[in-house]
Design a protein with these regions (language model features):
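N-terminal cap/lid segment of alpha/beta-hydrolase-fold proteins
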Residues: 1-30
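Alpha/beta-hydrolase active-site loop
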Residues: 67-88
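Hydrolase active-site cap/lid region
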Residues: 107-156
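C-terminal catalytic histidine-bearing segment of alpha/beta-hydrolase fold enzymes
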Residues: 189, 193-239
């Protein structure tokens, strides 16, 4: 069921392979471009709402879990290609990745850069070691049990794990994907200095296209900006 926050827009929900997919249609004439919200479609949606008002499609497909397993990233790529063909839109989408959706967005862009024009990352999970509570994040035992079960981690194996997004910044930088990032400087769930700040520093050191908006005193929630215009203006430079 499509979230009530999108009630002002036409939308469809349907089956895509073994997952549930959603497409939201823009106000007025579509501009042939897609925003791909990778996770939590109905949460803090003001960026997507504004993009719908500006003529963009918004799409989403569910996942069995949050942790961006590679088989699911490949499924996301098949979904984007199918939706672009169905809608007559460009395959190069705007990624919108919030929290764990940032992990999905990063891996998607790394594997399928031909399907990405620009990425908006909001308090993104870019470091699984941090997410699991082996840093400054508050340890969530239920999350750790779930992560360790799905990804076959032990407390020893995750300490030597080197397949988080922050371990692939050199490869990612070479793809020349513009990034706009939003974060709270008091995030206790996905601490910025262990996640997004690593990407920010790397982009700045290597001349990447980047805009960053920090929110003083903000924890992991709420996501986004009260006025999404700065995010929208950044992404529209690259579509």
């Amino acid at each position: 069921m499509i979230d009530a926050c999108f009630s002002a827009f036409k939308g469809e929900e349907f089956q895509f392979e073994d997952q549930t997919a959603t497409v939201l249609y823009p106000d007025g004439a579509p501009n042939g471009k897609i925003v791909f919200r990778t996770e939590y479609l109905g949460a803090f949606p003001n960026f997507e709402q504004e993009m719908l008002r500006r003529g963009y499609y918004v799409i989403n497909v569910t996942h069995p879990n949050y942790y961006a397993e590679y088989e699911h990233i490949h499924q996301m790529a098949r979904f984007v290609r199918e939706m672009a063909a169905k809608l007559g839109a460009s395959e190069k989408c705007i990624l919108s990745g919030v929290s764990a959706g940032g992990l999905q967005a990063f891996r998607f862009a790394l594997l399928y850069p031909e399907l990405v024009s620009v990425a908006y990352l909001d308090a993104p999970v870019l470091n699984l070691l941090s997410l699991a509570g082996f840093g400054d994040a508050e340890r969530d035992e239920a999350l750790w049990r779930n992560l360790s079960r799905i990804c076959n981690f032990t407390e020893s194996s995750i300490l030597i794990y080197r397949d988080s997004p922050i371990d692939h910044l050199d490869e990612f930088m070479k793809l020349d994907i513009p990034v706009v990032m939003v974060y709270g400087d008091s995030d206790t769930v996905v601490p910025y200095h262990e996640n997004g700040k690593v990407l920010e520093d790397y982009y700045e050191a290597h001349g990447g296209k980047l805009a960053v908006f920090g929110k003083a005193g903000c924890d992991h929630h709420p996501h986004g900006l009260e006025d999404p215009t700065p995010i929208v203006e950044f992404v529209e430079q690259f579509v």
